[in-house]
């Protein structure tokens, strides 16, 4: 497989903007694909290239077997991303994507001795806080679907479509297994700012659990709360984008 086809396999909209001076890598939530961030590139300045990471089992990679181990995901993506971190870069991850972005940034730091310029984590408690429940992926279908319903991220019409759910359930179980099997390990905090985004009505991710991300950086830290539940990033995306643009422009500003 050529370099270009391999990049296009894992990263959507990558290396297409010759004016880019910074890349923002976006990692979706459990069960989600790169299309979750499809429109975001339209709202960032041309100096910032917005790339979505596409994991196996999603959308155009739907025929591939989903990965069920976070470390395996991180090791593969950390290798594939190397040609794209030739300019400053940042991560945005939502829910499961926040956990992946955190461990991916750690692995890149270890392998390449470079930090992202900013880590944006969304809809996920700090990694050092154990999950209250880790075995969602082992639940019978009916109970598992009820858990999905409580998160309010899957339309009811889809949850009630047996044929559609037969396609989605293996992917969703794989992703919940990724989160449920995660084991946090202590390491040095990052030398980059971290921003934690949360939904004011997200009962599963409290302000306090977002505030705990502070332990993971030696630099600036902030929590931004927006209207909405666990999937607030849809109704509050413009506010999130405005905040991220402001933070990333600080990186691009000429040093005097």
From Swiss-Prot:
<dbReference type="Pfam" id="PF00975">
    <property type="entry name" value="Thioesterase"/>
</dbReference>
<dbReference type="GO" id="GO:0016787">
    <property type="term" value="F:hydrolase activity"/>
</dbReference>
<protein>
    <recommendedName>
        <fullName>Gramicidin S biosynthesis protein GrsT</fullName>
        <ecNumber>3.1.2.-</ecNumber>
    </recommendedName>
</protein>
<dbReference type="InterPro" id="IPR029058">
    <property type="entry name" value="AB_hydrolase_fold"/>
</dbReference>
<dbReference type="GO" id="GO:0008610">
    <property type="term" value="P:lipid biosynthetic process"/>
</dbReference>
<comment type="function">
    <text>Probable thioesterase involved in the biosynthesis of gramicidin S.</text>
</comment>
<dbReference type="GO" id="GO:0017000">
    <property type="term" value="P:antibiotic biosynthetic process"/>
</dbReference>
<dbReference type="InterPro" id="IPR012223">
    <property type="entry name" value="TEII"/>
</dbReference>
<keyword id="KW-0045">Antibiotic biosynthesis</keyword>
<dbReference type="InterPro" id="IPR001031">
    <property type="entry name" value="Thioesterase"/>
</dbReference>
<comment type="pathway">
    <text>Antibiotic biosynthesis; gramicidin S biosynthesis.</text>
</comment>
<feature type="active site">
    <location>
        <position position="95"/>
    </location>
</feature>
<keyword id="KW-0378">Hydrolase</keyword>
<comment type="similarity">
    <text>Belongs to the thioesterase family.</text>
</comment>
